[in-house]
Amino acid sequence: VNGDRYELVVTDRQTLLDVIRDEVGLKGTKRGCTTGACGVCTINDASGAAILSCLTHALEWDGEAITTIEGLEKDGRLDAIQQAFVEYGAVQCGFCTPGVI
C-alpha cells in the first residue's frame, strides 16, 4: 500500500476498502454506496488502473501494489491532479474528492 508492505491477518469476508481503512488506518479512501456506483472507494493498482475497493476482496490483492490518495504526493508535493483540484477549487465538500482523483 503506497509503497509500504503490511503483514495483516485478513478474512475472506473483508474488502480491500475494509483493510485499507480499518487495518492499515488510511482514511482517505471513503466508504459510500458499497455497490461501486459512487466511486468514493476508488484506488489504483500498480498500472494506474482504477479499482473499486468496496467491491474487491482483500485476499485477491495479497502481495500486490496499490495506491491510495495518501500515496499520490511525493516529497511533500501534491501530484498534478491533486494540485489542479486545489488551484481550480474543484473540491466542493471534499468527501468524494479522493475517489475522483
Cite the ranges covered by each PLM segment.
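Signature of N-terminal electron-transfer/Fe-S-associated modules in redox systems
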Residues: 1-101
